[in-house]
Amino acid sequence: MSPGAAIQRVTVKGRTINIVTLHTWPQAYGFGVGSADQAASAANKEGDKYREFEIKYICAQTVNNPAYASCQDWLMMGDFNSRSRADNWYYGYPENDTRLLVHNHILDHTDLKDIIAERYPGSFISSTYGNARIDYMYASPSMYARIVNALTVMDKWTTATQSPYVSNFYDPSDPRPILADFELKQ
């Protein structure tokens, strides 16, 4: 896995919440592909296929892991570097487009809900400074039911400015933060 993923378990008001954070492979070419073969790898959509491998592994080790079968409260979030069929009305990709593989797996093989897509149906809310949503927050049904508010933060503190030091880098970051408030009663 590159860049990586982690699971954290926190207890709030007697509830154990399992939080999965991740950042999947960011390139169009496959992981470990040498520079001479990167164009061919990208043409074969190997970056998308590697991200699918990553999310299958992450789900198998966390939300779908029998060791966690008794755990109901889950959040999964991060930079997925992929598109979701929940936004495909906006993108217009073919249904079998490899850019949709990651979220197809989550939506078809877990009970996690895409917080932003569920809260704002029919609205496309970019998580980057362009017109892409590649950053997501998912919640299990028990956590989704406790959402008070959720939004993608777009304010003066999250407005990108090009770095004076690196031509393809932006401050503060290329993805915008997703903020969700939950009501956790005992």
Write out the residue ranges for each language-model feature.
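Structured beta-strand-rich core segments of catalytic domains in phosphoester-bond hydrolases
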Residues: 1-29
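Extracytoplasmic/cell-surface-exposed regions of Actinobacterial cell-envelope-associated
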Residues: 8-11, 56-59, 66, 113-115
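A long, amphipathic alpha-helix that forms part
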Residues: 42-70
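A solvent-exposed, charged loop/short amphipathic helix patch at secondary-structure junctions
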Residues: 29-49
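Metal-dependent phosphoester-hydrolase catalytic domains
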Residues: 64-75, 82-186
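Active-site metal-binding loops of divalent metal-dependent hydrolases
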Residues: 24, 79-80
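A short secondary-structure junction signal
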Residues: 20, 30-34, 86-90
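Beta-strand elements within well-structured catalytic alpha/beta cores of enzymes
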Residues: 19, 75-76
